[in-house]
Amino acid sequence: MSNPNHSALAYMKKMGFRARSGFTLIELLVVIAIIAVLAAMLLPALSKAKEKAQRTQCINNLKQLGVSHNLYVADNNDQIAPPNCGGDSVLTDPTFPAGWLYKPGEALPGVAGLGQSNGPTKGLFYATLKSWSLFMCPLHKTNTDAWVLSSVKFTSYLMNGAVINGRTSFDWRAGDLGKTYRNSAFKGTDMLFWESDELDPGYFNDGASRPNEGLTQRHNSGATMGHFDGHVEYVRWKRYFQLVADPRKNSLWCYPGNPITGR
């Protein structure tokens, strides 16, 4: 019996087919060059797509904070949650009331003899959020010297200090004691939460910030900001610095201008 493979080979030779031995070196180099060009074209687009996805997650985090804020004021006679201000001394003092982010004296390991790290779990918003990850921007790097030196290592977002006082004289003690303005004293378009400058650990010694204490550089040429009505906006640095420098009251310097009457 004849071998069918031999018959097939004979037929292919008869019809003019020839088997190739493989790619030549020049052909391989051409293919590699094409792949390199395509990679150079695609990588920037992929990088932008990844950053956009992470920014979307950050925006969602701020939206969740906005929901928590509005649920809190609805349940507390229009009163805004304490902003967790006052720095390290208040952060470790359990005699002060809980704020939106944490309960003083119960946030850090070993504080007041507790020997545990509760982070934001004792904060007033955690009952709604139920997740540490919602307090952190996915682009916030935790392998930097600034992160190591930060007292508060469980948030990328800070509350606007305007909830306790005006532009030139912030009454941090009022905030420490839980005295804040009512939510109705602000416009829905006023800015409540933002991503502060993560390069300065001093800005993360509590849960609040003055508007002129810097903005993150994580999201290219701007940052995400949460407003009193719950909506979130991507604000470019240029606009942020214009608002900071504006001597008039605006959506960033949004202090009501009247004495606090709450609580």
Regions found by a protein language model. Give the residues of each.
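N-terminal leader/signal peptides at the extreme start of proteins
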Residues: 1-25
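Local alpha-helix boundary/kink/capping signal
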Residues: 8-10, 50, 144
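Generic anion/oxyanion-binding catalytic loop in active/binding sites
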Residues: 11, 35, 47, 54, ...
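Intracellular coupling helices
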Residues: 17, 50-57
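Alpha/beta-hydrolase active-site loop signature
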Residues: 22, 53, 239
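Short, well-structured segments within or immediately adjacent to enzyme catalytic domains
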Residues: 56-263
